[in-house]
């Protein structure tokens, strides 16, 4: 009988303590949507000839911008695709860099440059056209972002 009372008391105390103590590791970040800056694919760097294949950066990319208030940064999420048009299928893998240039509003000063190496693996089949979808993120200081930035995209 005493064992049962002790077990009931133990479980009741454990339950009450676990419900009343907040998680000390829990962090709340306030994130809000932000207007995205102007962006453009650089004309000369929108496609790339790789011998038996042509890589192309289509213009149907999508930007989503978020302000992370407690860190004072703006995160820009870039959804884009790379198209591969095969002339002949000799290779199964192609490498390309997706490059993002961040400039000031006047396009005179390059603030930052981000490079993302992309590995495009082709499966053996009869198709000649492949679409690879990607998502990359960049982070810009809020003060820099508020002073005005532009984004330029390229592949090489």
Predicted segment positions?
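Bacterial Sec signal peptide processing site at the extreme N-terminus
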Residues: 18-35
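Eukaryotic non-globular, compositionally biased segments
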Residues: 23, 147-148
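One-face residue pattern on beta-strands with alternating periodicity enriched for small/polar residues
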Residues: 75-81, 152
């Amino acid at each position: 009988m005493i064992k049962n009372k002790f077990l009931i008391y133990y479980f009741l105390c454990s339950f009450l303590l676990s419900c009343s103590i907040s998680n000390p590791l829990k962090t709340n970040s306030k994130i809000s949507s932000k207007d995205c800056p102007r962006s453009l694919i650089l004309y000369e760097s929108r496609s790339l000839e790789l011998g038996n294949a042509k890589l192309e950066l289509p213009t149907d990319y999508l930007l989503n911008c978020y302000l992370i208030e407690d860190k004072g940064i703006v995160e820009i999420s870039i959804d884009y695709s790379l198209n591969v048009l095969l002339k002949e299928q000799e290779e199964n893998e192609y490498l390309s860099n997706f490059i993002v240039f961040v400039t000031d509003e006047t396009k005179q000063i390059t603030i930052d440059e981000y490079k993302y190496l992309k590995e495009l693996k082709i499966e053996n089949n009869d198709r000649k056209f492949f679409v690879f979808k990607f998502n990359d993120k960049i982070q810009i200081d809020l003060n820099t972002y508020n002073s005005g930035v532009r984004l330029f995209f390229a592949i090489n």
